[in-house]
Structure formats: structure tokens, C-alpha cells
């Protein structure tokens, strides 16, 4: 039976119950979350808030049944419809912070259909659901489109479409709009709202940016590593505890984070010149005719909708993609004896000249602990062990990662992974720092700290080039803008 003309069928909404529940990742001393008590009724729409590292992602992964017993230690109980989540995985659909981690197959249609196939949905019904889900999330591409050509934001919509097609009783969204442009944020939010209204499924959303989801949810739960901090209607929670929550790092409407404190800047000099530059992949141009300069002691941002080429431009500037046409040349001030073409630089030459932070942080992790990850660059520069340790310790403290020094990078929250990826690039002290969505996954406190750190780098003479959808970051940090709209 379809509902509201969406083509989606009614489902049996799931109930959630947690009693003194806790989870500790393997090799960690601290619990990700502990003493959690809550009950979510069938069909409720719940926004889960909390500071970065509060255990939000751990909770939704546990509800999705993807935390295996050998991945950590559990205490208490966490149940869906009276059963452990792992006993009924088809009941929950999960969209993670990193859409790349959920792209499984090579074509868009096949990827959306994958979950339905695993649930044994009849073939004709699968493809009907695939078309409905594509329409619901506004992903206007042919079913045969290769998934590897999609932008980060498009992959986020693809992941959401896969969940919508499964029509689960519980929809779990972990920062579902993190990689979307402002228009895409509203489109996906509305797509979620329509699909939930049509199916009646229970909804649990994790999102740092509260305002986007207030029109959709009917309940807000705030958690910390020690359990539930606040629970009630959105109006009750935000009116009664708005200032307290903002002070803890929750993005509460009306409580903007502080702007960075600036000092006098070092003198500026040109480092990279782009003239009539064309960028793309596999020999095919995405953007053409770009001309701009990147200078020291300045922040340049590139903005534009999903699929406009921001990531491709950032990777090209970072010396990781070959320009399709035009010119991208380093000045002698940056090249310092190396080739004037960044794409020709060896990895050791890039380390001190241009550091790049990818959109998906875990794509650049190579070590088994946070401390070891931070030491990779300094070791490649052949610094002595004392100098390596000093740099690592400074970055651990500066980016609030010292308590996680011995943790596996892949077990960190999305916000913690982002800070680690920035720290790994800073560890070699490059003159240009290229960042793809640098503020993704941050609470308001860590956002302010990260923006302050970048401001201090710029004031000291470094250059920052950022691809971003974050209007607040652009407002307080940008000196120059390359608009790809």
C-alpha cells in the first residue's frame, strides 16, 4: 500500500530501548558512551545532539547492528523491538558520515538496489523502489551512471536513496547533509521528511547543525559519554538549556561560535598562479577557464554546488591531479628549486610545500594509532625522534586529540577524524594547506578551535585553500573566493 503519492509503502515502525548501555572500542581505555538510558517509541522522529566525541555515531552504529562483538566491549542492553540490533539488521537502514564507505557497486541503479536484493525483495519491486528513491533524494542521473564519477554530495544522496529503497522500520542518519551544498541540504532534509511521513518509520538523526532538522523532528535527545544530558521536545530542550548546550559545543540557533582572533599578518607573496586552468578527471574537463592566485598569509576558498568541481580543483592545486588544460604553476618562492609544476613533485617535495586534507578523512590514514599517524610525515622528512615527538605532542594537544593518542584512527568519530586529518597535514609544516570541507563534523567548540588554528597559520605566513559549503567558515575566514557556481 503506497502513501501520499510517493510510491513508498507503509512499514512497521521500530521501537528502541537502551538500559544502562555502554560501548568501549577495542584498545580504548575510555568508554565511547556509558550509562545510556532511553526509550524511543515507534514512529518518533528524534534528533540526537552532543559534542564531538559524545558517542552519537557509536550509538547509531550499534542500532544498525554493525558493531561486532570483537570490536569492543558492551555493557547493559540496547534493543530494537525487544531484540539485539544484530538479530534484525533488515529493520534498520543507516547512512554514515562518509558516503564513500557505503558505495558498493559500480553503477548508481545497482548500488541502490543492493540492499533490497539482500532483503529478498522481488525484482520488479526492486526497480520500482530504485526509481522512487532516486526521485525522493533529487539525484537526477541515469541508472547506468558510474558511482565513481559522483561528487561527495551526490554519493551522500546515493547512500540515502539506498536506505529509502529498503523501506526499513528504523532510519538512522549520521550527519546526512554534511557534504551537501545549501540547496542540497534542504532537498535531502525534505526527502527524508517525505519518506518518513509516507512509510511511518522511526527516525533517528545525528546532526551538529540543529536548525536544519527542527521542522522535521518531534523530540531532541542530548547525550554525552556519561549518558543522556537532556530529553524533550525541541522547544523545551533548546529554550530551557540552549545556552548550556551551546557552551558544550551543540550548534544551537542564536548562539554563533566566536570569530577567530587575528594578529598582524606576515607579508604576502604569490605561491601558485592559475591561468585559464581546466580541471577534471580521466582526461575530461569538469571546469574550464579558471584564473586565480594563491598567496602566502591568506585564505582562499572555493565554493559552489555539489558536482561543480571543488574537490577536483583542490586536488589539482594539491599536485595530486594532472591539469586538463591551461596553466598551474608554482612560483619560485614555493618551488624552491623544484619543478614549477606541482604535479611533477615527488611525495617528499610535496610534504613541505603543499599538504592536502581529503574530503573523507579515513582515505588518508595509514597507521594503527593516532600518534603513529601524526608521525608519518615527520618521519618521511627524516626528522630525529625528539623532533618527531615534539611535533606530534604539540598537534595532539592543539587539536584536542591527546586523550586519543593510542586509539585506532578508524574508530574515531567523524569530527575527531577530521581534526586528525588536518593535524597529519600540519605535521610537515607545508606552506600551502589544501582542505576539502575542513569543518565537516565539528561541534561549535571544535569548529571555533579549528578556525582559530587556521587563522593563526595564515597570520604566521602560511596559505590556506579550502573547498567548502560552510557559509560561517567563508564569512569569518575567506580573503579570496573562487566561485564555481
Task: Identify the meaning behind each predicted range.
Residues 164, 425-426:
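ABC ATPase C-loop
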Residues 64, 318:
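Helix-to-loop junction immediately C-terminal to a conserved catalytic motif
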Residues 160, 422:
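Hydrophobic anchor residue at the start of the ABC signature
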Residues 67, 77-88, 327-349:
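ABC ATPase NBD Q-loop/coupling interface
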Residues 227-250, 475, 485:
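Conserved beta-strand-loop-alpha-helix hinge in the C-terminal portion
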Residues 171-175, 433-437:
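Catalytic Walker B motif of ABC-type/P-loop ATPase nucleotide-binding domains
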Residues 146-150, 154, 408-412, 416:
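Conserved ABC ATPase signature
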Residues 125-142, 386-404:
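Conserved ABC ATPase "signature" region
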